[in-house]
Amino acid sequence: MQEHIRKISALVLSGAVCMGMGTAVLAQSSPSPSGTYQPGDKTNQVPPTTTTPEPGPAGTPPSPSSPYGAPAQPSTTPPSSTSPSTTPAPTARTIDLNAVTSAQLVRAGLDEPSAKLIEQNQPYTKPEDVLQVQGLSEQTKAALKANMDILRANPKMK
C-alpha cells in the first residue's frame, strides 16, 4: 500500500514539476501584457488570423457588405526604411543558478527538497553542473534538462 502511495506521489510530483516548468516557459514566450508595439519589434507580434464567412439565414451566402462576407485583405504595410534598432531585444526571463533561492525555485515549479539541494550546492560554473547535484530525482533532472536554455550560472559578485 505504501509503495503504491509512493508511486502515485512521485507521479503527481513529476507532473507538477513539468507543469510548473512548462508554465514558466510559456510565460517567457508570451508577449508582454503592455501590448505596445514598435515598428520592427518582433517580440509582440500577433499571428495573423483568418475568419471563415458565416452563412446568412437559410444557408444564403453572406453579402459583401457583411463584416463576415468581406474577403480578408493582407496587410500591405511597407517595410521600414530605417535600420533595425541597435538596442538588444529584451531577453527572456532566466534563472541564475548562483543567485536563485529555494523559494524562487519552488515558485518556478520544483519541489522543495530539490530546490534546497540546488541552493545548497551553489556556486555553479555552468548551468549543466546542476544536473550533477546528488539527490535530485530523475524527473527533476529531466525537467531541468528540458529548461536548460533559461538556466544561467553567472559568477557571484562579492
From Swiss-Prot:
Biased composition regions of type Polar residues, renumbered to the chain: 27-46
Low complexity biased stretches: 66-94
Extent of Pro residues compositional bias: 54-65
Signal peptide: 1-27
Localization (cell): Cell inner membrane
GO cellular component, one term: plasma membrane
GO BP term (any one): photosynthesis
Keyword Protein transport in annotation: no
SUPFAM superfamilies: PsbU/PolX domain-like
Keywords for this protein: Cell inner membrane, Cell membrane, Electron transport, Membrane, Photosynthesis, Photosystem II, Signal, Transport
Region described as Disordered: 27-94
Lineage: superkingdom: Bacteria
Membrane-protein topology: Peripheral membrane protein
Protein family according to the UniProt entry: Belongs to the PsbU family.
Its job: One of the extrinsic, lumenal subunits of photosystem II (PSII). PSII is a light-driven water plastoquinone oxidoreductase, using light energy to abstract electrons from H(2)O, generating a proton gradient subsequently used for ATP formation. The extrinsic proteins stabilize the structure of photosystem II oxygen-evolving complex (OEC), the ion environment of oxygen evolution and protect the OEC against heat-induced inactivation.
Subunit structure: PSII is composed of 1 copy each of membrane proteins PsbA, PsbB, PsbC, PsbD, PsbE, PsbF, PsbH, PsbI, PsbJ, PsbK, PsbL, PsbM, PsbT, PsbX, Psb30/Ycf12, peripheral proteins PsbO, CyanoQ (PsbQ), PsbU, PsbV and a large number of cofactors. It forms dimeric complexes.
UniProt protein name: Photosystem II extrinsic protein U
Species annotation: Gloeobacter violaceus (strain ATCC 29082 / PCC 7421)
Source species taxonomy: Bacteria, Bacillati, Cyanobacteriota, Cyanophyceae, Gloeobacterales
